[in-house]
Structure formats: C-alpha cells, structure tokens
Amino acid sequence: MTFLDTGILVGALLEKHPEHAPCLEALEESEGAFTDAHALAETFATLTGFYKVPAAAAAELTLGLKASLAVEALPLADYETSIGEAQRRGVMGGGIYDSLHASFARRKGARRIVTRNPSHFAHAAPDLEILTP
C-alpha cells in the first residue's frame, strides 16, 4: 500500500504544474494508493492559496480525487499518536502534519510514502520507504 502526500495530489491535479506528469503517474500507478482527508484539506488550501485556483474549481478537483484513491478521515487516536511521535522524534512546528500523515500511513499498513518533499518525512517516517515521483 502507498500513501500519497499532498504535493503529489496537487501536482497530479494541475496540468501546469512542473511535475504534473510524474505526480499523475504516481496517482494512477501506485499500488493500493490512499491518503487521508487532511491531505484533501491541504490540497484545497494549496490550490486556492498558492496557485490561486478559484474555490469552486479547487473543490471539484480536490473532491474528485476520491475516484482515484482511497480517502479516510483521521480519528482522534491518530492525532494523539502523531503528537506523541512528534515529541519523541523532535518534530516541531508544521512538521506535525507530516507526522500525522505518517502515523495514518503506518496504521493503514503502508510500506511507502510518495511525496515531493522527502526531507519533511525524515524525522516523521524513518521506518517507511520515502519515494519521490
């Protein structure tokens, strides 16, 4: 199973993205591709904020991802696990969000995380294979 990080989702959705082709391939070809609902919120935020995609189009694109990969909401237990792991591994600031993704990926049995930001997972997921497209 393969967890897809927000950067992969954004890159796959935007044809003008410089890494669109490899991100789209990761979305379409990854074995057992899945993500968490928090990554959908991050995707919407990135599309509307950084890329200035109109909200209606960003919502349609983001929610359309459900047709291409499994998406699951995060329970409180994942947040508790992530905060504890972040503290033990020295993860600080916004790194908690990558810790949250990593905790979820582990719980779901992922063997790998595909991301455009491998350094973000250096402390959060040293036990998982981290791939870039």
Regions inferred by a protein language model and the residue ranges of each:
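Anionic, Ser/Thr-rich low-complexity intrinsically disordered regions
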Residues: 71, 124, 131-132
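Residues that scaffold the ATP/ADP-binding catalytic core of kinase and kinase-like folds
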Residues: 11-13, 46, 124
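Short loop/helix-cap segments at secondary-structure boundaries that form the rim of catalytic
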Residues: 119-127
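Glycine/small-residue-rich phosphate/adenosyl-binding loop
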Residues: 40, 52-66, 70
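Histidine- and aromatic-rich ligand-binding microenvironments
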Residues: 5, 35-36, 94-95, 117, ...
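Active-site neighborhoods of divalent-metal-dependent phosphate/nucleic-acid chemistry enzymes
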Residues: 70-116
